UniProtKB/Swiss-Prot annotation:
UniProt record similarity statement: Belongs to the SlyX family.
Gene behind the chain: slyX
UniProt lineage: Bacteria, Pseudomonadati, Pseudomonadota, Gammaproteobacteria, Pseudomonadales
Listed name of the protein: Protein SlyX homolog
Pfam families from the UniProt entry: SlyX
Top-level lineage group: Bacteria
Length: 69
């Protein structure tokens, strides 16, 4: 009887662990989708920033600082 009770307990725990594992997997998949979407948005923003800097003549690193008064 004790062995049967222990087996039932283990089966119950495994079922809960399977459910938890599935839920965690779904969260990881959704997070990966969010990361990929954010990476695309960041790349688009970088491109827009580079385009705007090109239009306004962006700051050149070799440009001398203005004289102080």
């Amino acid at each position: 009887m004790e062995l049967e009770s222990r087996m039932d307990d283990l089966e119950c725990r495994q079922a809960f662990q399977d459910d938890t594992l599935q839920a965690l997997n779904e969260v990881v998949v959704e997070q990966q989708r969010s990361i990929e979407r954010l990476q695309l948005q960041v790349a688009a923003l970088i491109k827009r920033l580079e385009d705007v800097q090109g239009l306004v003549g962006g700051v050149e690193e070799d440009e001398a600082p203005p004289p102080h008064y």
